[in-house]
Amino acid sequence: MGEVQVVDRGSREIVVFLSGDIGDQMADSLHGAVDEVSQMEGLGGLSHAVVDMHGVTELGPSGVAFLRELAERGRHRGFEVSFSAMSGPAHRAVEAAGWPFIEASPPPPA
């Protein structure tokens, strides 16, 4: 089971922590997190949202859709979205979805 947590870090920055298996069973929670980020943006003039994925063990289509939705919302509302501390599974899923990286992700363990 996965988890999503939205944390207001102050200084116009929000961190969204993803951990565990971010799959279809999390779709409602992920949509809620996008709405929560938007509400915080409306209150405090958000300039940056960071998605921390160090604890992600699986990033399925719903997780990738969440990242796209959040990035799109940021483009429309004027805040930057970046990814940090990506686990191997998260990096591979994001890379496979078409986000470019300077370095290719390592191959999955055998």
Regions found by a protein language model. Name each.
Residues 1-58, 62-110:
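STAS-like cytosolic regulatory interaction modules
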